[in-house]
């Protein structure tokens, strides 16, 4: 129940008002159920997008811009969520996206199912603390099961890595080009992967995705270097430079205006001419300084004015201006250049190296390609597509594919998809629960039912009877050798998903279960919600009082 004020009565019977007027408070079972309802509502929205046969959502923002996607992270990001419990779910789901790169929908749907099962236990008067403890115990056991059945994968298992990427891409808008995109994703990740001790490390920041609509998805290609969505600044500059020695600048090549206001008294045309000549000399000296280091390519984060462009062109130097800071840093990492903030400090050893810097036409636009860099651990995927929204969705899909391949290489453990892991985990949890004392047993069983809801959602979204599929799954997993049996979403039959090549990183599964259990436990521990009056309402009331 929601009330405006909650008086507290001392033993002598004097009411004490502790909350500011206008503050709303809900507490007890009603507060808990309201929070559960909010999380389940978000989960229900994402549930129909789950799996390769899931539907898409059309999201329209306040400006009327339309996004069509089934990417869980994007849907949550675009939704204007108001309820505090729902906001918690969104925040934890974003953490899943940051940590594993995929599995956002699994996290949200599983959290919703955990709270749905918890609500049933609350109805039979099981305390929230017991439910939370039971869920923690079930999560510990589930994690053990997943880690014990996971199979090894290595940097050299290229075919398995491609299957992992294809599994991620199956549910995306780019599914028709999944084979091609899977190859690109694996090649890109393997290129930037670094061996550190006995483990592999992948920094996805070394993989740049540049979007350019036009052409088809299959026109997308991998560039072993950096691509700048810029063009060479002057028509007389070279368009192709081999054995490029690159100067990276964080300073403008133009006459800067003084920070204080100055007035110059000019009495003759000769003085104007002298002023312009002085400015030219300053710029010419800067260009001479750059050329003296041996640089034949200049890339700056700031501007290059017309006079500086002219002098650079005369020296045969290719120049690009107003490049994003993030791109400048990528070029620095790739070429070994040092970013210079003052041309007076520029030295030959500050220059980066690349085999080729070239301006090329891509669709209707020109772009600058930097290839054969000193450090090959930087690559660019030039993403093409027939229209802008398709390219945007392809970028989101490709990001997920890159993430799961990186997870697999770094962790070296993978599992089968199609609900196989969930069915195996649920089977073990039911057996484990029967050995537990007291009400904890009921909470562990509830966790198992929530896990089983995931393959049921896959089946439902593919048009199959979820109950029938669940019964078949349970029957198949009675045999230990059938641990990788899951749902064939085309036929509804239970098949060996490992032999079908439906593979996922262990990290995605583990992190999704952990994140969902964490948010469900947080929600179940809340028994009081105190909402301060909104600032806008207070201002409105003050204005109304002043008018009176």
From Swiss-Prot:
Family, as annotated: Belongs to the TCP-1 chaperonin family.
Pfam families tied to this protein: Cpn60_TCP1
Alphabetical keyword list: ATP-binding, Chaperone, Nucleotide-binding
Gene: thsB
Annotated InterPro entries: Chaperone_TCP-1 (IPR017998), Chaperonin_TCP-1_CS (IPR002194), Cpn60/GroEL/TCP-1 (IPR002423), GroEL-like_apical_dom_sf (IPR027409), GROEL-like_equatorial_sf (IPR027413), TCP-1-like_intermed_sf (IPR027410), TCP-1_chaperonin (IPR053374), thermosome_alpha (IPR054827)
CDD domains in UniProt: cpn60
The protein's role, per its UniProt record: Molecular chaperone; binds unfolded polypeptides in vitro, and has a weak ATPase activity.
Protein's UniProt keywords contain Chaperone: yes
Source species: Aeropyrum pernix (strain ATCC 700893 / DSM 11879 / JCM 9820 / NBRC 100138 / K1)
Protein's name in the database: Thermosome subunit beta
Lineage summary: Archaea, Thermoproteota, Thermoprotei, Desulfurococcales, Desulfurococcaceae
């Amino acid at each position: 129940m929601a009330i405006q004020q909650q008086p507290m009565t001392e033993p002598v019977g004097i009411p004490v008002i502790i909350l500011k007027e206008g503050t709303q408070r809900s507490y007890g079972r009603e507060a808990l159920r309201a929070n559960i309802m909010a999380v389940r509502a978000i989960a229900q929205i994402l549930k129909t997008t789950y799996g390769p046969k899931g539907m898409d959502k059309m999201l329209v923002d306040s400006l009327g811009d339309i996004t069509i996607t089934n990417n869980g992270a994007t849907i949550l990001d675009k939704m204007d969520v108001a309820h505090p419990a729902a906001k918690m779910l969104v925040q934890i789901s974003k953490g899943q996206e940051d940590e594993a790169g995929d599995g956002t929908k699994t996290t949200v749907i599983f959290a919703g199912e955990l709270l749905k099962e918890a609500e049933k236990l609350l109805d039979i008067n099981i305390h929230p603390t017991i439910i939370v403890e039971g869920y923690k115990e079930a999560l510990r056991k589930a994690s053990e099961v997943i880690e014990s059945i996971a199979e090894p994968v290595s940097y050299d298992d290229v075919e398995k890595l491609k299957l992992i990427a294809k599994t991620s891409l199956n549910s995306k808008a780019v599914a028709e080009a999944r084979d091609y995109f899977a190859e690109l994703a694996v090649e890109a990740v393997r290129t930037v992967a670094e061996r550190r001790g006995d483990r592999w490390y992948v920094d996805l920041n070394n993989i740049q995705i540049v979007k350019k609509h036009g052409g088809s998805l299959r026109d997308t290609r991998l560039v072993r270097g950096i691509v700048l969505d810029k063009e060479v600044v002057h028509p007389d500059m070279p368009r192709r430079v081999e054995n490029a020695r690159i100067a990276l600048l964080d300073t403008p090549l133009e006459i800067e205006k003084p920070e204080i206001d100055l007035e110059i008294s000019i009495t003759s045309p000769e003085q104007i001419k002298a002023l312009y000549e002085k400015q030219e000399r300053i710029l010419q000296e800067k260009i001479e300084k750059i050329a003296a280091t041996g640089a034949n390519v200049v890339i700056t984060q700031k501007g290059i004015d017309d006079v500086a462009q002219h002098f650079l062109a005369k020296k045969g130097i290719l120049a690009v201006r107003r490049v994003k800071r993030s791109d400048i840093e990528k070029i620095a990492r790739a070429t070994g250049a040092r970013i210079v903030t003052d041309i007076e400090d520029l030295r030959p050893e500050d220059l980066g190296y690349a085999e080729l810097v070239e301006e090329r036409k891509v669709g209707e636009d020109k772009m600058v390609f930097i290839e054969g860099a000193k450090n090959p651990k930087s690559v660019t995927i030039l993403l093409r597509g027939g229209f802008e929204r398709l390219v945007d969705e392809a970028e989101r899909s490709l990001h997920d594919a890159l993430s799961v391949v990186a997870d697999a290489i770094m962790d070296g453990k993978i599992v089968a998809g199609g609900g196989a892991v969930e069915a195996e985990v649920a089977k073990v949890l039911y057996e484990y629960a029967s050995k537990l004392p007291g009400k904890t047993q009921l909470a562990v069983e509830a966790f198992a039912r929530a896990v089983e809801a995931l393959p049921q959602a896959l089946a439902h979204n593919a048009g199959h009877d979820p109950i029938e599929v669940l019964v078949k799954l349970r029957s198949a997993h009675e045999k230990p050798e059938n641990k990788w049996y899951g749902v064939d979403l085309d036929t509804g039959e239970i098949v060996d998903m490992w032999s079908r090549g439906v593979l996922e990183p262990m990290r995605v599964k583990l992190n999704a279960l952990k994140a969902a259990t964490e948010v469900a436990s947080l929600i179940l521990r809340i028994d009081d919600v105190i909402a301060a009056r909104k600032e806008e309402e207070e201002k409105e009331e003050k204005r109304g009082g002043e008018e009176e």
